[in-house]
């Protein structure tokens, strides 16, 4: 019995997988791999060479999920698709081509250690056991039902390289039994226990930094997780870089401060708990592999020297977050959220400060009043100075899309493109606010960041200038990402809450829907429902929204790098008419109700009477939040009724201040 198979493979575990398929009698129609990266330290076998030696067609496409490649694979008519250490996720349309299923070999005991670099992460975390798992592939990475697992013991002497060898052997053993059983239809699949799932992101050379305030055991685990052939654990010594290749833990630190050299022979460094003996290492990236004592001599270390980085004993430097548009709805709430966390320092710029007055005295909040189109030198300096940049400046009120389309383009695209280019120039992480508007008139039930088409109307419908300006900038950022820009795009879905707008903005029509409706209630004018008010939206509480955004800034294990993330509440879907009816109900029950005129009723009007002829509306806009759940461990919790109540209360109290001001002037 044979089965036509398409394989996605890389690394020598990819080679082990291909060899196991051949040994088990599978007919491999094609193999997809990755081209060799000259910047990468290649210590593993070549999938391409193995395929060439066995007469198997091999390809290395930039994007195997491209429709052209999916069409070619469909013509192969595979029974199975296998993935062995292939680095990219395979799309659902591609996986669906396998008549009998698509399966992946993952280097951990799932559901633990899903994601990238599991062999390195288990060592970093001091695990004593790992393994390999063969599982069915589904849309979500590493989440499908388990077919087989092979356990691997981790010895204290193991490094990432030795553990990788063990995993390669375990993979061959597992596949030797599982693949024939699969051909014979003798496998059973066990769903993963999601309550035990953990997810880890990719590791970078910067993750190898030694922080001497940490326990020696933790540093020992880091050293063996990133030792050769990986870039190594490191710290600064004067103007030099000390790379540690081999180390061991010694009990006690002689009462010395973290980072203090206790002795040079052996080279022993005090840690936050116990001490670390450096057996071997090198000076700088191009240095020789040396013993610890010789390394100490080369670096000019003596007993009592203090390694740079020992200042980490006072705690790591705070992350500096630059928020442009800090006085806006998202900016002021996000600043408040970040300032509750000692790890962050916030720098902000905006043309006003009324919404952030409550934050101005905070010692970790630094504000300058200014315009992004004018204060370019200040902005460039602070992008260079800060770690994370959030350009939140935009025109985002629908009437302006038709009333001032060129101004929308100039601010939302041109000015923000300058900010993105500064981030590219200074290699800074940018978290950019895309918008749910980019999905336009998409007909999908749930709008998916990675799958849904972005559909807009004809050119004469100018309301789409905001959507396409944002979409174009999304695409520019994505292209810069391919050249090294660290970015995350987030798409808010109808966030609401206190300080959303000002009632004055609603008076000139330049506000969001709920503010306009509240103004109608406050002034005793009819609530206008455009085109019947049947358009549905998913309303998200600002507290839920900024919590998700704060987690993007946290970026645990770098899981948000290069991602697009919808942030919305699909359970809070309601029409604009339903929004107005709930507002009215809460308005009538509010303690301040008696201060305002009687309700003037609902009135149906054509949208073009308010927005102009260039307007088009969207019937529904519901997000898929699978990415947010998976990457951020985030689920919205605030019900729409509560959000409406909080928003209404804020604006009614603001309206009361307006009512009281004239009498105050007269009293003077």
UniProtKB/Swiss-Prot annotation:
InterPro entries named among the record's database cross-references: Arna-like_SDR_e, Bifun_polymyxin_resist_ArnA, Epimerase_deHydtase, Formyl_trans_C, Formyl_transf_N, Formyl_transf_N_sf, Formyl_transferase-like_C_sf, Lipid_A_modif_metabolic_enz
Binding-site positions, NAD(+): 350, 371-372
GO molecular function: carboxy-lyase activity; UDP-4-amino-4-deoxy-L-arabinose formyltransferase activity; UDP-glucuronate dehydrogenase activity
Site residues, Raises pKa of active site His: 142
A Gene Ontology term for the protein's cellular component: membrane
Residues that coordinate or bind UDP-alpha-D-glucuronate: 396, 401, 435-436, 463, 494, 528-537, 615
Catalytic activity field: UDP-alpha-D-glucuronate + NAD(+) = UDP-beta-L-threo-pentopyranos-4-ulose + CO2 + NADH; UDP-4-amino-4-deoxy-beta-L-arabinose + (6R)-10-formyltetrahydrofolate = UDP-4-deoxy-4-formamido-beta-L-arabinose + (6S)-5,6,7,8-tetrahydrofolate + H(+)
Keyword Transmembrane helix on entry: no
Coiled coil feature spans: none
Keyword ATP-binding listed: no
Keywords for the protein's UniProt record, in alphabetical order: Antibiotic resistance, Lipid A biosynthesis, Lipid biosynthesis, Lipid metabolism, Lipopolysaccharide biosynthesis, Multifunctional enzyme, NAD, Oxidoreductase, Transferase
Residues the record lists as binding (6R)-10-formyltetrahydrofolate: 116, 138-142
UniProt site (Transition state stabilizer): 104
Active site: 106 (proton donor), 437 (proton acceptor), 621 (proton donor)
Region feature Dehydrogenase ArnADH, mapped onto this chain: 317-668
Record EC number: 2.1.2.13, 1.1.1.305
GO biological process: one example: lipopolysaccharide biosynthetic process
Subunit structure: Homohexamer, formed by a dimer of trimers.
Similarity annotation: In the N-terminal section; belongs to the Fmt family. UDP-L-Ara4N formyltransferase subfamily.
Function: Bifunctional enzyme that catalyzes the oxidative decarboxylation of UDP-glucuronic acid (UDP-GlcUA) to UDP-4-keto-arabinose (UDP-Ara4O) and the addition of a formyl group to UDP-4-amino-4-deoxy-L-arabinose (UDP-L-Ara4N) to form UDP-L-4-formamido-arabinose (UDP-L-Ara4FN). The modified arabinose is attached to lipid A and is required for resistance to polymyxin and cationic antimicrobial peptides.
Protein name: Bifunctional polymyxin resistance protein ArnA
Lineage: Bacteria, Pseudomonadati, Pseudomonadota, Gammaproteobacteria, Pseudomonadales
Gene: arnA
